């Protein structure tokens, strides 16, 4: 049974599919935070065109956020998973084994991130919303001038009879 997480944002909705088999600890953290409402009303604090959109920090600064395991937890790097294109769901970190609640979604291939960030899913639907986010006007610190935020995140259990 796959786990999907649906996001309603100020720019539209999108759904991500989690790679539970490849990054079980990361997926459990992400799904649990979403289920608890942790991501509700959190802004996308960093958007870089042709690179990625980043969110998951309840302080909105890019320096906050914690995991369900405490402050930070270890990477789950899978050599078979790569940042090969747009729509890759990956953990943001400030170095090895430093994962909390922040995550990003790629807007294009980012091979230099391979082996440095845990890939734990992909955008399943609503990629156009993510692409539109990547085009918003930002300031010199890559923060959107007009706020882009997650209104609500929720778990969508897939039964397999799609």
UniProtKB/Swiss-Prot annotation:
Catalytic activity reads: [protein]-peptidylproline (omega=180) = [protein]-peptidylproline (omega=0)
Q: Which UniProt keywords apply?
A: Isomerase, Rotamase
Q: Which InterPro entries match?
A: Cyclophilin-like_dom_sf, Cyclophilin-type_PPIase, Cyclophilin-type_PPIase_CS, Cyclophilin-type_PPIase_dom, Cyclophilin_A-like
- The organism sits in which domain of life? Eukaryota
A GO-annotated cellular component: catalytic step 2 spliceosome
* Residue intervals of the PPIase cyclophilin-type domain: 1-155
EC id: 5.2.1.8
GO terms in the biological process aspect are: protein folding
> Which GO molecular function terms does the record list?
peptidyl-prolyl cis-trans isomerase activity
Protein family per UniProt = Belongs to the cyclophilin-type PPIase family. PPIL1 subfamily.
Q: What is the stated purpose of this protein?
A: PPIases accelerate the folding of proteins. It catalyzes the cis-trans isomerization of proline imidic peptide bonds in oligopeptides.
Identification of the protein by name? Peptidyl-prolyl cis-trans isomerase-like 1
